[in-house]
Amino acid sequence: MDQSQKTVLRTITIIGGSLSLASTIIAFILFWFFKENRSFTFEIQMYLTFSIFLYSLSSLLPYEIESVWCSIQSYLLNTSLTSLSIWSTIMGYSCLISMIHKTHLEQHKKFYRIVFLSTAFAFPLVLSSVILFTKIYGDSNGICWIDVGTEYKVRFIFKMVMMFYLIDWYIIIVNVFFILKIFLMNRRSHQNKNELYAYIKWYPIVNVVCEVIATINRINGLFNGEKITFILSIIQVIFDSFEGLVFVCIFLFSPGISQSVIVFCRRIFNRKNEISTSNSMATGDNSISDDNALFKVNNEESDFTKKIEEDYGLGI
């Protein structure tokens, strides 16, 4: 692949990484601001968002081959990608187990927190550290990851499968199982058809789509050697770079966050109207009307929080 093609891939990576990084910051702000919506499911989403943050940050690091930056970028990229895929699987599992028993995760969240963090953070860190000693990190066409100069040589295929792709393909299979199971359970039970499962199921779906596209490109590379198809590489980079952004968008449009933002904006709007009316009107009728409007909005916020807790059992 020539330098101009690498530049195109690098540009797409930077654009996707920048948008993902900005969206993760917004997600962290909302997590801090809307404390009343926090739940264990919300907490899991924040862990996944942190993986996206690491991936976005690593994709924006300097692209300098044979430098310390290349090793750092490769390490963070491999860690965050593996972690992100595992968290998508955890979201699918959380959705499935919650459809069977709504309060199960909340009741055993201490146990699940240890298991999830060990699986989705500790394991990728150890795996990426092991790969460091194999000396296969390097130029991966526009970014530092697994060196494309050695990736498709026979002696490295086993290492690649064992250290990354085998895990990646296993995650794809598990996510497909969760997706099919969730759809089947939704069809059989009208009780489970609510907004919570409608948006959580998209985490494993998005991950499967992105990983399948990456797999197609890798298999194509195995057959064609180092003559990687540029179009396939562009498609893979687009899906890889924007996967994190899509995950954050799913989170931002989730029932708890989107409704909380709407209610908050209504409160601000009604308070401004209240101040404006009280300053311009001498009578108290409009003031009473505005107080009632504000009281109504506050009730909407309270009712919404209660509805999330009662209907979904998991908050958001």
Positions of the model-derived regions?
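First transmembrane helix
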Residues: 7-36, 49, 53, 93, ...
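Extracellular TM2-ECL1-early TM3 structural module of rhodopsin-like
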Residues: 10, 51-94, 98, 104-105
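Class A (rhodopsin-like) GPCR intracellular loop-transmembrane helix junctions
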Residues: 28, 38-51, 70-77, 104-125, ...
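Intracellular signaling interfaces of 7-transmembrane GPCRs
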Residues: 36-40, 97-112, 176-199, 253-283
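Class A (rhodopsin-like) GPCR signature focused on the TM5-ICL3 interface and adjacent 7TM helical core
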Residues: 89-90, 96, 162-191, 201-217, ...
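Extracellular-loop-to-transmembrane junctions of the mid-late helices
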Residues: 123-184
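Seventh transmembrane helix
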Residues: 202-203, 208-210, 215-218, 229-279
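Non-transmembrane, juxtamembrane loop and terminal tail segments
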Residues: 259-316
